[in-house]
Amino acid sequence: MKVKVKHLQRFFSSDASGGIVLIIAAALAMVMANTSVTSGLYHSFLETPVQLRVGALEINKNMLLWINDALMAVFFLLIGLEVKRELIQGSLASRRQAVFPVIAALGGMIVPALVYLAFNAQDPVAREGWAIPAATDIAFALGVLALLGSRVPTALKIFLMALAIIDDLGAIVIIALFYTHDLSMLSLGVAAAAIAVLMALNLSGVRRTGIYILVGAVLWTAVLKSGVHATLAGVIVGFMIPLEEKHGKSPAKALEHVLHPWVAFMILPLFAFANAGVSLQGVTLAGLTSLLPLGIMAGLFIGKPLGISLFCWLALKLKWASLPEGTTCKQIMAVGILCGIGFTMSIFIATLAFGSVDPALINWAKLGILIGSVLSAVVGYLILRQRVTDTRLAV
């Protein structure tokens, strides 16, 4: 018994364990969603209504939306804390290093959209899905990266985090501008006021994390009610919590330490389980001949790494930015392939683009997203494994 416990402790303490659990959860979801015996149970779980009421405020969501909007806000809170630490004390501390993932993210959004339009520009309906391959699923991309464990340079992981956050922010802006028609200006005003309070707390030197979380809950609720993706609130709160150490304690680092195991072994696996169960009913290989899925596949698998690599090369050539310390151009290119994992964010944009037009288009889009994302995950992992191994051997 002691030996089994020791093996479990060793597994959960390894850097790769979170990625393994996430992949298992995603595989289980795919099997359950596409098996007649379990598909009903799977979808019933996701559609379970959950109600939260505080005074006159009432939020009614199903389990899927609570996982995606609430639990994933905690994940983005952790990402915000980690990126802030690296911007101030770590691999993104210099201006040229900090601007590098910003430029990479721009390339990773612009080029995939252009590749998609190269296939679908002539079709006015399909053209509406131009933003589908511009998105990156940060949770799955980091999950695949985690499979490589401690072999991955910290700076490379932070680069992917920063790039994916900017990519996600870009996707949120795109959704708000092009796919959302009922934004609540009142809720956005409340959100702006909550951000102002968070900034005031930070500038006043308030170090009690609980106060930031409380105001953050108000911010999350306001963003949710506004029609904008609520996970944005997590990133903002993460950037507002003080990092500076006093008496040997840093509020941001302490919270980061507490959140890590919960995010790795509960929140991300739940997210994977809730979102990876893509039903393949109605999806046929004949659909692969359609320009819609071909454009998405090409955008994710070719456009993403091409855009990121091209913009990074230009930034380095023009001396606008510099590589994160301890990384190589080949590793950056491999990370660019991983960013082709569009998955949940791409599916979300596809439902917004085609949901009111034709359900068949959503099925075709899902086919392109699934194949493009799987190709990006497998090829990106294999190439990156070789690149980090080569670097370690050279040292």
Swiss-Prot record:
Signal peptide: none
Keyword Ion transport: yes
Membrane topology reported for the UniProt record: Multi-pass membrane protein
Cell compartment(s), UniProt: Cell inner membrane
Keywords (A to Z) from UniProt: Antiport, Cell inner membrane, Cell membrane, Ion transport, Membrane, Sodium, Sodium transport, Transmembrane, Transmembrane helix, Transport
Catalytic activity line of the entry: Na(+)(in) + 2 H(+)(out) = Na(+)(out) + 2 H(+)(in)
Family affiliation: Belongs to the NhaA Na(+)/H(+) (TC 2.A.33) antiporter family.
NCBIfam families: NhaA, PRK09560.1, PRK09561.1
Protein name as annotated: Na(+)/H(+) antiporter NhaA 1
Organism: Klebsiella pneumoniae subsp. pneumoniae (strain ATCC 700721 / MGH 78578)
